[in-house]
Swiss-Prot record:
HAMAP family: Ribosomal_bS6. InterPro entries: Ribosomal_bS6, Ribosomal_bS6_CS, Ribosomal_bS6_sf, Ribosomal_S6_plastid/chlpt, Transl_elong_EF1B/ribsomal_bS6. It comes from the Bacteria. Residues 104-116 have a biased composition (Basic and acidic residues). Pfam families: Ribosomal_S6. This is Small ribosomal subunit protein bS6. Keywords: Acetylation, Ribonucleoprotein, Ribosomal protein, RNA-binding, rRNA-binding. Belongs to the bacterial ribosomal protein bS6 family. GO terms for biological process: translation. The modification N6-acetyllysine is found at K93. GO terms for cellular component: cytosolic small ribosomal subunit. It comes from Escherichia coli O17:K52:H18 (strain UMN026 / ExPEC).
Length: 131
């Protein structure tokens, strides 16, 4: 079996359907004895340019190991699903399991925000004890 990176973008009005779509696609992959190495739901993001007069889309990234038949089936499903506005399937040489740069950046922002919040509460507590 080969390794693939799959990214698909869902119409923002159909964001509530994304968990069900992910579930169906993962079931199709695992049902054919494939493996999912990484699954990331990036959520709603701004598009670089408008697609069908849309400026935002819901992004999902999957790194999988699956037979070609399943990948063909997924591509057909993407093509005929009106909620999927763009999709891309790329073959990769190796399984990618580490977090993507998108998720790493999000985690770093969260850590900085938490550190800042902790510093401000520590400063506020220090100010209260001095009085």
């Amino acid at each position: 079996m080969r390794h693939y990176e799959i990214v698909f973008m869902v119409h923002p009005d159909q964001s509530e359907q994304v968990p069900g779509m992910i579930e169906r696609y993962t079931a199709a992959i695992t049902g054919a004895e494939g493996k999912i190495h990484r699954l990331e739901d990036w959520g709603r993001r701004q598009l670089a340019y408008p697609i069908n007069k849309l400026h935002k889309a819901h992004y999902v990234l999957m790194n999988v190991e699956a037979p070609q038949e399943v990948i063909d089936e997924l591509e057909t499903t993407f093509r005929f699903n009106d909620a999927v506005i763009r999709s891309m399937v790329m073959r990769t040489k190796h399984a990618v399991t580490e977090a993507s740069p998108m998720v790493k950046a999000k985690d770093e922002r969260r850590e900085r925000r938490d550190d800042f919040a902790n510093e401000t509460t520590d400063d506020a507590e220090a100010g209260d004890s001095e009085e």
